[in-house]
Amino acid sequence: EAMQTVKPGKALDLGCGQGRNSLFLTQQGFDVTAVDQNELALEILQSIVEQEDLDMPVGLYDINSASIGQAYDFIVSTVVLMFLQADRIPEIIKNMQEKTTVGGYNLIVCAMDTEDYPCSVNFPFTFKEGELAYYYKDWDLVKYNENPGHLHRRDENGNRIQLRFATMLAKKIK
């Protein structure tokens, strides 16, 4: 859906895992850098990159360090922030924002903990209502919602765990 808005450019997949988003973005014409702190996932992605002869840097990176070095047109972090240190989230988001070019975009999807959908999973971090939107108050919120969704994880009865997710595509306007 974001591809209807975001034009190909230099992209960073922050917390890429095995590279589903990275590979998709590469197919869409983006110049992607894929980083994660999971070495096994990176090895799997690197083997795909080599098999497909793709020009995609894959690297080990601790997102908690909030030290993205170069600027990107598009920074993607989907279902990643909830696994990071809660006290580092403000710095991580600030670093993402600072390293996004003017006119560039951030795409974030993250679990929430709300009154109507309390988070039953012991994630290190979850957003509260309106919190992600507040971080991006000086950006153009192209898409923003806090809708219910399901995790792949299941509860003790075998049902997929339901909770709200903050989903945001924001454009840096200054």
Give residue ranges: language-model regions:
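Class I (Rossmann-like) S-adenosyl-L-methionine-dependent methyltransferase catalytic domain
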Residues: E1-L12, G17-S67, L84, R88-E91, ...
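A conserved beta-strand element that flanks and buttresses the S-adenosyl-L-methionine
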Residues: V76
